[in-house]
């Protein structure tokens, strides 16, 4: 078995450094991925991503075509939801990987075009907001090239099921089970009370057009990279999903339960 390791910090004592050391001690062939490296180019069977949700999302952005299965490795103080194995349990997880005792779960992504130019695919969500806060955004939402609504709001979020417990939920969107084949559209603080969160089949083509605002607007990819948009945002199902390794059989309901418990803990602080 060949394992690639993806991460952002390789200094001594870092999570990536620890993972590499554990694999070396177990005699497992491994390769550290540098920026621009493709896991498939190194004939990797599995990619271990060192870090929390942000690092896993960044790795997903870099892989635009066929995805080598990913297993997120975190440290015990992490509050993320995409990683599955604590680094303290990595040795036993590797033993299961070597025996083939795991499943691969395919999670679809959003293909995103900004003003006709394709940008990085997203795993959680894509959001459209004015660059200056507290500024009204006017736009038209189209589904399969037909106008669905004209809206004035603070912004709009388009989410996948796995992203439904992230920004979308904070803005009033529904929690959606991970294997649901849908997109979620959430208008943020619309002036029209009928602009409730919308669920559409994931074979739909979504467009945000006729964008009007006093200031420049940005498309935000998975809460990270920003791309200036002037006329149109387009979203559809990406041809290639992200493939997650599952050594622990957590259901979608368990992931939602974890999110709810975290919210309760924050409220009680």
Say what each PLM segment does.
Residues 18-22, 64-65, 172-176, 201-203, ...:
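Short, solvent-exposed amphipathic alpha-helical segments in soluble enzyme
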Residues 58-60, 81-82, 138, 167-170:
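Short glycine-/acidic-enriched loop or helix-start segments at secondary-structure transitions
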Residues 67-71:
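Proline-centered loop/turn at the N-terminus of a beta-strand
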Residues 76-154:
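Catalytic core of DAGKc-family lipid kinases
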Residues 115, 120, 128, 133, ...:
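ATP/nucleoside-binding phosphotransfer catalytic cores, i.e., glycine-rich phosphate-binding loops
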